[in-house]
Amino acid sequence: MDTTMTATDTITATLPSGYRAREFRDSDREPWTEERNAQVHELQRGTAEEWREWEQIDPPKFRLRVSVDAPDGSLAAGAELGPGFLPREDGTLFGGVNVMRAHRRKGLGDALLKTVELEARAAKAPRILSNTNAAFAGSLEWATKRGYKEIGRRIESYVDVRAFDGAPLRDVVGRVEASGIRLTTVAELLRERDPAATAQFWHDLWEAEAPMWDDVPWASPTPHWPFEKFKKLVVDSGKMVNEATIVALDGERIAAFTSTGKQGTDRGYTWMTGTGRDYRGRGLATALKVKLLAAAKAAGLRAMLTTNDEPNKAMRGINAKLGYVMLPANIELEKTL
């Protein structure tokens, strides 16, 4: 008789009676999306199909990705552990545990967290990074009791594009343009370029982004993404809204930019807004955002969302002037192993 236990069998043995661990399935996305959507603002709601699309574009790597079925066969919980979107040189891993609200307070979370941490220690990871959201009742308290400490907050906010009026900030845009800075869309820039020049533009944009990225007050130092990943997700994915991605040019030099991605059918998301170190304090970021919101409105979007790290008071202040409304914070967590 074969008495060999699989990894999921081992996890199942730690779960309450009737619950069963198994490998993650593609069909798990629907119930997880429904569960999350029930707890967040309607503008933050996503779809299982979008989740699939992004993972097809950039397949994640996991050391552990399991789901737990309830006695009735419905999805009850899950856990993940892997190097994350941008792997860290020191071997830090990103992990998480989720339990459906209907199945909490039964020990599922503790059992799965133990599995995650054992796997991370086996990989000799120095720490686990994770996150939760202030909208998820009790989640921060649960994590804190288990040794995870809050290391930062990322503030998501939105503005109703249809109601946006850029007139009060027209003078800022005028001053920037009068200084010799050209504000234009990526769509316009690409129309001016042949394939070779287009390829060079994307590489120039990525290079210009690097010092801006380094200056973001991340809760945990985050390496600038490789050009191949940038190209795959920004250039080749078809997700960027070129008509609402604005670049500030000083001659041929990229002084600043704000990039917009499509989310759902009628929302845009600011992926990055950055200003070169030599150009700060001149109103470029404000001018870019004014142009962005006007372009988003013309493109038929009803709302724009963005995320800023809590210490980034300058950018958050600009967004407040533009009418952005804050949503519950994403809370960054860390546990040293």
Where on the chain are the PLM-derived regions?
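Extended hydrophobic/aromatic segments used for targeting, binding, or gating
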Residues: 255-272, 280-291, 295-301, 305
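Acyl-donor-binding surface of acyltransferase catalytic domains
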Residues: 1-15, 101, 105, 113-197, ...
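Conserved donor-binding loop and adjoining core beta-sheet/short helix segment
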Residues: 26-29, 36-135, 156, 250-268, ...
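A mid-sequence, solvent-exposed acidic-amphipathic segment
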Residues: 219, 226-247, 251-252, 257
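Conserved acetyl-CoA-binding loop-helix of GNAT-fold acetyltransferases
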Residues: 105-118, 145, 275, 281-294, ...
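Short alpha-helical
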Residues: 27, 137-138, 313-314
